[in-house]
């Protein structure tokens, strides 16, 4: 049932490594268990409040391009794709079974261009190769017609706790003041 599926998802999210969700090439969940002594599995008040808010929301599961038909002046898109790897050791792009390589990044840029033409607002986030000093200007090249702002975000998921902390990311948008 839908309730059982949602319950199992919440359980996995609360008990797996840092609440990470990813699947292997077969589409199977493959995150190791976390090392929690007493994880808080269910926050009843929060679940009920979120459930009430979601009654007015349509959630779609599928390719981002399928939402293009909804793009209008009243639409706001926040796009948080798999981030472009900054190094060979950070090349994990497989939260989904199909991955998200440079060609997918370009397909996302094309999507952003089309929804912007329909007067929809979008904000996309990604890794920052320039801020990471790799010198790569991939995003500046493909998103040259949009605004790019650098921000710092806290990263809590990393196998090496010493590598957790603030990292530079980019916000790409078709609105003036990010």
PLM feature spans:
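Short glycine-/acidic-enriched loop or helix-start segments at secondary-structure transitions
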Residues: 88-89, 133-134, 160
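Conserved Class I SAM-dependent methyltransferase catalytic core
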Residues: 104-154
């Amino acid at each position: 049932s839908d309730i059982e599926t949602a319950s199992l998802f919440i359980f996995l999210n609360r008990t797996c490594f840092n609440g990470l969700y990813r699947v292997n090439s077969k589409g199977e969940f493959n995150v190791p268990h976390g090392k929690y002594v007493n994880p808080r599995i269910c926050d009843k008040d929060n679940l009920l409040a979120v459930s009430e808010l979601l009654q007015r929301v349509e959630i779609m599961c599928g390719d981002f391009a399928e939402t293009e038909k909804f793009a209008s002046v009243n639409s706001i898109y926040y796009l948080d794709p798999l981030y472009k790897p900054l190094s060979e050791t950070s090349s994990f792009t497989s939260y989904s079974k199909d991955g998200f390589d440079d060609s997918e990044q370009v397909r996302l840029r094309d999507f952003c261009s089309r929804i912007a033409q329909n007067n929809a607002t979008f904000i996309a986030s990604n890794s920052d190769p320039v801020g990471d000093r790799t010198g790569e200007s991939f995003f500046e090249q493909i998103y040259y017609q949009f605004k790019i702002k650098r921000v710092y975000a806290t990263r809590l998921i990393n196998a090496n706790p010493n590598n957790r902390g603030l990292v530079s990311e980019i916000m790409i948008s078709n609105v003036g003041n990010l």
